[in-house]
Amino acid sequence: MSRAIWKGPFIDPFFFRKNGSSNSNNKIYSRRSVVSPKFIGREVEIYNGHKWITIKIKEDMIGHKFGEFAFTRKATIHKKKTK
């Protein structure tokens, strides 16, 4: 189920407290926040629970959540069977 339209997109209050300096701190803990147009072209670091993942925000990412771009689980690698 998607979010109700009347509520609008969720953006963590942390982004509103910043003083407009885009280069001072680009680390984002809030994976649940929606990517807004003001982030286009900026490189941000998203925390996946283990390390910081650096991602450059592009126009296609608007409307998605930050957490979609920093995976929290390790990809499985299947070993080849030897005969």
From Swiss-Prot:
Its main location: mitochondrion. Keywords: Mitochondrion, Ribonucleoprotein, Ribosomal protein. One of its GO terms (cellular component) is mitochondrial small ribosomal subunit. One of its GO terms (molecular function) is RNA binding. One of its GO terms (biological process) is translation. It is found in: Mitochondrion. PANTHER family: RIBOSOMAL PROTEIN S19P FAMILY MEMBER (PTHR11880), SMALL RIBOSOMAL SUBUNIT PROTEIN US19M (PTHR11880:SF67). Belongs to the universal ribosomal protein uS19 family. This is Small ribosomal subunit protein uS19m. The lineage of its organism: Eukaryota, Viridiplantae, Chlorophyta, core chlorophytes, Chlorodendrophyceae. The gene is RPS19.
